[in-house]
Amino acid sequence: MNVPFDRYVSFKNADWEGKSQRVMAKLQSHIDAADNPFWGYFAKKRTELNEKQGLDDLRVLHNYLPTLREILEESGDDETLAMLEDLEVTCM
């Protein structure tokens, strides 16, 4: 029997998809501003990971968590940083 594995079963009722979408929406302003070379790289890798490898945004955020945290701290974006940290604690 071939049953698809849901690696997020432990996140039931944690709204990991909604939280991931909200963090990505907040990060979009940084991507659009392009004030750091990382943002262009991150946007490109997100597209590649989503489309070519089938990874969702939670996984993309997890892959870049230390860098995202550092850049958000440096930029003073405490709101997005708090959202990212909540996502990490509840869903990663």
Curated annotation (Swiss-Prot):
Record bears the keyword Transit peptide: no
Record-linked InterPro entries: CowN
Keywords tagged on the record: Nitrogen fixation
Top-level taxon in the UniProt lineage: Bacteria
A single BP term in Gene Ontology: nitrogen fixation
Protein family (similarity comment): Belongs to the CowN family.
Function, as annotated: Is required to sustain N(2)-dependent growth in the presence of low levels of carbon monoxide (CO). Probably acts by protecting the N(2) fixation ability of the nitrogenase complex, which is inactivated in the presence of CO.
Name the record gives this protein: N(2)-fixation sustaining protein CowN
Organism name: Rhodopseudomonas palustris (strain BisB18)
